[in-house]
């Protein structure tokens, strides 16, 4: 009996997987809906009756689960990098010519793949022994959230690929323009574009709900494969064989007139842009040969063997309803045009920044005017020009702050409120402090912060740690569960690295790169920085000795660490047990050899891909440079090194092998 049940379950699974492939991948179904539904219902019944036979590759998982997702944050096995960008065809052609020249010099036949750049949500799929093990969002490139339960419901994501292989794939999850408009119309809180809706669906905690949304996916890159694949073309053939959905508009180019053929393809895709059923915002080019990719390598931001050509922004016409003046955390005054809602490149636009008075005067804008609106880079709404002048004169920014009514001062082209007690500036500081890139206090959204501030519950970042949040229980939107989550998030923020706290203080010109420069020059604690800054003259000399810190930044650091308000905040956080020194694990591990050293890489390595190796070395405190210059401390050389080795030898730069590095430092700790 048991064997008969098991055999029937296996038979049903195989049949349904075959029919899914025929329908979703091959577009040639061999059975009707009734036959398919009957088989699926039978399989669901048997798996519920005999749960011991249910497996992680069952087609029934496509219908979600009633278990609630927790979206655990997990470290990516490989850094998930961005792409270099080109904004005109000349730039793109130069890149193609550069790749062709480098490939030719290294003895490679040049081939390049090209495909539309989907404007969706990036996802990384991890397969172990041929079964989907996890699905991580891009996150910050190092850590992503595991949304596997929701990704399993997407019809074109194979749960099992039929071979015991390991794969790490990048893809783009999207929703069509038509479905976006249809779904958005039914929601109480509508989304600005299809990408945001897709992201919202992916983060729903109940995967049963996700099944009801028509999410789709294109897989476009292999980050790792246990199979031997030599080219992108080989990889695409293999992915098709496994049942993944690939973009049908992807093309491979090689041979004569390479640049010309690619440019013609790009222009053709751009001309057809509005006809695509999903949003695209450019074309991505990639070197076809994987061995050449390894030689070309990576910067800390992007692979050198790929580039994204960004389309020109689409435009629409709208009318200015009102112009409001906003105040940022720095006190910067920004005029914003509120316009009649208009759809551009798949996003509803209702407002656009006007930058400053000079910009308003340059286009001659006032309330009631009809204007051309674009999304620059298909992201940022902008008023490009006045199409029809229906008002008299230009809008004038008041000479007083809309929040505190104090007089504004002009610095360059912008107006600023310099009142340290300005309510909107203070609120901006609190929002920045809580933001994901700073203290990352989950649950304290901008709306929640505005509510707490306007109700006089908080008046600075410090109040977040002294306010009794239990007072919120019973107020609209604040139940016991939500308040407890807020309290837990605030408590967890005390464990953030010191560099995050330093960034969260919002000190002018003190961004994360400058903070890392301080840390790598033994200024890795509050005590060290504040002690140095007590002696202004010595502090200036010491800070200017750090490459990358100029006079303006140095003066702002010294000024901040002599400011009583800022010092009082640091001392408050110190008493609460915040980390006031950057952990050695975040700076340098087990040896001072790599600490602060500037390095570059050439050639390929058997043990690690180049971007993984770069990540491992930078975690030890070293600083990666994408090009050889006299400022390097060493060049790391692998097999088949390029011209960087010759240049490094000419400059007298130290040459090291991976063997040399591993003799000095344990890279795998």
Curated annotation (Swiss-Prot):
- Reaction it catalyzes: NAD(+) + (deoxyribonucleotide)n-3'-hydroxyl + 5'-phospho-(deoxyribonucleotide)m = (deoxyribonucleotide)n+m + AMP + beta-nicotinamide D-nucleotide
Keywords per UniProt: DNA damage, DNA repair, DNA replication, Ligase, Magnesium, Manganese, Metal-binding, NAD, Zinc
| Domain BRCT as annotated: residue spans | 589-669
The record lists NAD(+) as bound by 33-37, 82-83, 115, 138, 172, 286, 310
* Record GO biological process: DNA repair; DNA replication
Q: Which residues form the active site?
A: 117 (n6-amp-lysine intermediate)
What terms describe the molecular function in GO for this protein? DNA ligase (NAD+) activity; metal ion binding
- The organism's superkingdom is given as Bacteria
Q: Which residues bind Zn(2+)?
A: 401, 404, 417, 422
List cofactor names only: Mg(2+); Mn(2+)
Pfam families in alphabetical order: BRCT, DNA_ligase_aden, DNA_ligase_OB
Write the Enzyme Commission number(s) for this entry: 6.5.1.2
Homology family: Belongs to the NAD-dependent DNA ligase family. LigA subfamily.
The job of this chain, per UniProt, is described as: DNA ligase that catalyzes the formation of phosphodiester linkages between 5'-phosphoryl and 3'-hydroxyl groups in double-stranded DNA using NAD as a coenzyme and as the energy source for the reaction. It is essential for DNA replication and repair of damaged DNA.
Supply the name of the protein.
Answer: DNA ligase
Give the organism the record lists: Borrelia recurrentis (strain A1)
